[in-house]
Amino acid sequence: MLYNIPCRIYILSTLSLCISGIVSTATATSSETKISNEETLVVTTNRSASNLWESPATIQVIDQQTLQNSTNASIADNLQDIPGVEITDNSLAGRKQIRIRGEASSRVLILIDGQEVTYQRAGDNYGVGLLIDESALERVEVVKGPYSVLYGSQAIGGIVNFITKKGGDKLASGVVKAVYNSATAGWEESIAVQGSIGGFDYRINGSYSDQGNRDTPDGRLPNTNYRNNSQGVWLGYNSGNHRFGLSLDRYRLATQTYYEDPDGSYEAFSVKIPKLEREKVGVFYDTDVDGDYLKKIHFDAYEQTIQRQFANEVKTTQPVPSPMIQALTVHNKTDTHDKQYTQAVTLQSHFSLPANNELVTGAQYKQDRVSQRSGGMTSSKSLTGFINKETRTRSYYESEQSTVSLFAQNDWRFADHWTWTMGVRQYWLSSKLTRGDGVSYTAGIISDTSLARESASDHEMVTSTSLRYSGFDNLELRAAFAQGYVFPTLSQLFMQTSAGGSVTYGNPDLKAEHSNNFELGARYNGNQWLIDSAVYYSEAKDYIASLICDGSIVCNGNTNSSRSSYYYYDNIDRAKTWGLEIS
């Protein structure tokens, strides 16, 4: 069985060296203003700086001081302390996934400085995960539930916005950190330096982690070691009411999985990701217009590349009650290389309107282009030599997905202590398979296949609303409703993937996943306590899951058997979720 690697970290020693005073600059984009030590500003729920106390949704913040003092080996260990947040790794050490309110990581939206980290390889129980250097972080904002029409799809479970450091009020300040993890006999080192010179601000960071096999009461588990490294740069320039920013970052991970086989059923088993790399270039522009109604304009754009190599091997021998066969050895090997290239641009305006209305409007365009190259080998050999068959395959896919969306959110203070937030987002999505070629070799026979070009499209409007009352001392009450929307990934729509001797087919007829979410909450801030509590209920439909093939067209007529495993994606699942959180 696959061994679920525990997330507990045992720290033997920690070194934290302050080069100079650490500066709290808490900015999400170059438009965000500096804040006092008594306030916590958040940006994820309103796409502009606002007090945490006035947030229309359940949100929690891991601030700079917590990150600076943390001796955890990963930011994931800080996230899992938040109620409603669960960290998993799908038995791939170091490949951390975030679940919120029971929803799979593929239904959690990951942002870096408000820019989405898309992952078209996402499946049933895995998404993009944590591919960021924590030494670059100023803070982390976690929104529970899909309560931000301002950021888009994928957020049925919630949103995690990683906000990076962007300069300071000194020429140079920084942190050098080294953590030894006795559970893996591994070290993690990181350094971050930031500062300001005239109208310029900067940040340079880097990290390296080399973790060994995990220690257990029964000894160290083989093949649980992993390694990652990252680098990042921020450059900003401020001129009057204009602010410009450039960010560059890179993160690379290599990992594998441990497999427990006490009965010796497998002669070979391995699941490896020798390379998972994310590279991004982002630009930001903000200006304070300070007109009668129009107050701020924000623009950002980015290019992002995610490359992955996946290698899998399974070899097993089973007895067969036939004198001509006696025993059959089946050996499967798969090697896949895929690359996702993303381009996106966002334009946003902030208005102050009469009758105490604060309006944010904007438009966004995003395109993902994915290429996948795979090679595989499957052999079947009997002990007697009666069966001796080997098939080698190669395939290549190209696909793309484009999204255009318009969004708006308005805060209306219509009476003393009362605030009503209303938001809407309209999507237009288009996905298409532009190329799908395959070839197989069996006993000297060559078979070529070419998939027909396919496409899928959708348009959807999602809404959210929140009503808040703050007429009591140190207490705010809220009631909220929001809709969730997750469009199928390119892998789920078009691609054929192989692992462990099984094949999963895409389904171009998939529908988007939907949810309706309700919440009642209260915040208390007094007597040195800040308490946020919420009761939530969610109804979801059209969840996408993988099913066993039964000879249907989507499976190319293949049927699952004891020797071959075939699956396909379909909309089948519904879910009702409810819970209580106090933090």
Stretch-by-stretch model annotation:
Residues 178-184, 197-199, 208-212, 239-241, ...:
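Transmembrane beta-strands of outer-membrane beta-barrel pores
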Residues 39, 96, 158, 172-174, ...:
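Hydrophobic, lipid-facing positions within transmembrane beta-strands of outer-membrane proteins
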Residues 334-348, 403-405, 505-511, 517, ...:
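Outer membrane beta-barrel strand-and-loop segments of large Gram-negative receptors
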Residues 21, 34-170, 185, 485, ...:
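Acidic, small-polar-rich N-terminal luminal/periplasmic segments of exported/outer-membrane proteins
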Residues 180-210, 220-258, 273-290, 294, ...:
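Transmembrane beta-barrel wall of Gram-negative outer-membrane proteins
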Residues 124, 177-178, 216-223, 263-273, ...:
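Extracellular loop and loop/strand-boundary signature of outer-membrane beta-barrel proteins
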Residues 243-251, 276-443, 452, 457-470, ...:
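Face-selective signature of the C-terminal outer-membrane beta-barrel domain
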Residues 1-82, 194-195, 229, 281, ...:
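N-terminal Sec signal peptide and the immediately downstream disordered periplasmic leader
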